[in-house]
């Protein structure tokens, strides 16, 4: 190890001790990068599903998932990645207008409310699994806390979706298995 490398190491250690904050490791940075890119795609899909939905409660849940969960996660992830000197994904998707009134979509092309609910439930479960994996790879308290908070919020949202699906009969009736 050269004198210059040793000096750099000592300087880095000194500042990390003062600031008590390490830079993101590769797993954390790549996790945030993936969360941002996938989140942007999910916003686009949620906008499309919102326009297919007929049920007002379902539309409200989709809007909540988009604004309170997905966009919040994207913004917080971008902030953390930028603070650590990481590059933000350049991928973008077209924005869609959210129509409160039902659109005239041919019945053969329109998703039913049950299909929309199942689709957003699948997106939610995949997102929660990805956040859980990213949480387990996090060493930074701030990053782990962000994932934990949003994962808890997502699970609460998922429960409300499940209740709506049960109330409207969008889930199949499963009979008890008796031996």
Model-predicted regions and their roles:
Residues 123-179:
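Preference for long, well-ordered alpha-helical segments
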Residues 4-15, 79-118, 177-179:
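Carboxylate-rich helix-loop segments that flank metal/cofactor sites and access channels
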Residues 1-6, 56-93, 158-168:
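Conserved alpha-helical segments that form or flank metal/cofactor-binding pockets of metalloenzymes
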Residues 13-24, 30, 57-61, 106, ...:
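A cross-kingdom feature marking solvent-exposed beta-strand/loop segments within repeated
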């Amino acid at each position: 190890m050269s004198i210059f490398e040793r000096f750099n190491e000592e300087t880095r250690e000194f500042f990390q001790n003062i600031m008590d904050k390490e830079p993101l490791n590769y797993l954390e940075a790549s996790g945030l990068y993936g969360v941002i890119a996938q989140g942007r795609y999910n916003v686009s899909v949620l906008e499309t599903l919102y326009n297919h939905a007929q049920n007002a409660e379902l539309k409200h849940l989709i809007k909540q998932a988009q604004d309170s969960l997905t966009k919040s996660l994207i913004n917080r992830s971008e902030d953390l990645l930028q603070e650590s000197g990481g590059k933000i994904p350049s991928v973008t998707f077209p924005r869609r207008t959210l129509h409160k009134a039902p659109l005239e979509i041919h019945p053969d092309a329109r998703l039913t409310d049950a299909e929309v609910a199942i689709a957003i439930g699948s997106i939610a479960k995949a997102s929660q699994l990805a956040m859980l994996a990213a949480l387990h790879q996090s060493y930074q308290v701030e990053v782990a806390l962000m994932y934990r908070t949003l994962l808890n919020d997502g699970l609460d949202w998922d429960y409300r979706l499940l209740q709506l699906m049960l109330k409207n009969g969008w889930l199949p009736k499963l009979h008890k298995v008796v031996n």
